[in-house]
Amino acid sequence: LELSLMPHSILQDTRRGQNNADGFGIGFYTDSKLGAAPCLFTSTTPAWNCVNLQRLASKTASRLIFAHVRATTEGSLSEDNCHPFCHGSLMWMHNGGLGGWKQIKRRLGERLADKWYLGVVGGTDSEWAFALFLDTLERMGHDPSSQPENGFGPTVLRKAMLKTIAHINELIDNIPESVVHAENVDTRSLLNFAVSDGHSIICTRYISSSSDEAASLYYSSGTLWETRAPTPGSRDYQMERSDKGADVVLVASEPLTFERGTDAESHRLRRGD
């Protein structure tokens, strides 16, 4: 799977009408001879305006890639705050926000073992959520630093993810009602998380509110992801399916093709998946 850039228009968050111009990051797993940890490249430059990203993307291939364009909600404009975040072989990114963040941040930190608390270097709620995931994984009996040869497995990652979301909800539920009303606290959490150990990926589309819509998430699978036009520089892609296999799986916050009615647009994950 080649790392390739999308045009500016497809990087826009169309549902909320904002440009994700506050930096970006890519993370990808390389040959096992180089170790289990992923390679990271982050920048505070908008993704569509970074010539180094274009140079790297045209010459980089990986079996598993994370890519994230940032629109600041928490934390300053800094490379420390650009997703994805990594520890050992684990890679994490997030689209959304933790409800009541200012009210739960201290208590979330108090739940963490010192090494996970001290391991947070940026100021985003997303990185703190990753620290909570690492702490949860360790409490389940799995060392997040161990980098197992075949990964932790989807069952373990899924269980740790569900527990992490449950912990976040518990912290928010414990905000006193008087504080919620007095400070007009938005307790809704948008938790579109993605985590991988280089072998398995767990993605969530979740909102804590029963009356609001979760942030969008789309997927497409097939045998080949290629440009629709053979012209050099084309960035209009489509998923090819030569058989029933799924050699390529793409998950994204926005539709991945301009063609309406394709799998990338119609296979929308339901809230809570």
Predicted region positions:
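Conserved short alpha-helical segments that host acidic/polar catalytic motifs at enzyme active sites
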Residues: 1-94, 98-273
